[in-house]
């Protein structure tokens, strides 16, 4: 009887272990091609072509050439009203090439607008949006304009369309970016992350209340709530893709919501990576990259998004988030900006 019980225990263990760990034959691998040693932690990036704009925490904003692997510029602060001000802690950055702008935010502060043109001068313009900005995304508009969506941790979803405004005071030309339209939609949740396709949809991660989806007729028009999904855990970031949305939910792993599910506004989201703490998700084709903080990254095969398959966990340092650059993977880490190749 004891022998039989031991055999049964072994069978159960093998079954459970096999469910948790991917089959060794199906595990992918990664190759670390380059590490760009940014000054300070590489917290966030915005990539345009082969140029990366890096949010480097207390080390400010840095501009890197990814192809050559060299730093082109670094800005620890900026001049405002005759004084030089150092950055406290840059958390987010985004580049608007058409308007020659760089947007940056420090933790829980407004979005700062800087001009950065062909002369490579980093010129402060003004601040926009909310004092409690957690995340933002911006889209260029014709006629020297842009439209921005913001996850405001106090007020909800904010949006606005801004235009360049020039005034002259004592023969001094002052250029600011002023709102021409905008507003906000309140939510019971605490917005943490935001994404938009720039065409008709905005998605916002709202902490303990899950994820919300908003639709708009044209870019710059008022978004209206389309659907809301209450997910386990704390929804921190959301990534919109062609097939739906991927949501990172901290200690409760990740979720996938198909476009059909979002449109219907009801049904069960697909949960995966339940045993992992997921801070951020990026996707490219059939690959999903989950950022795990101190545990590195986890790779998933999402060729069947209704059943994501694990393809391995890789200790590549402390990872904040990831982004695909052509067919390679960029990792924002405490050791700098890492460039990897995924061997699938």
Place the predicted regions along the sequence by residue:
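Feature marking well-ordered beta-strand scaffolds used for ligand recognition
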Residues: 19-344
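Sec-dependent bacterial lipoprotein signal peptides
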Residues: 1-18
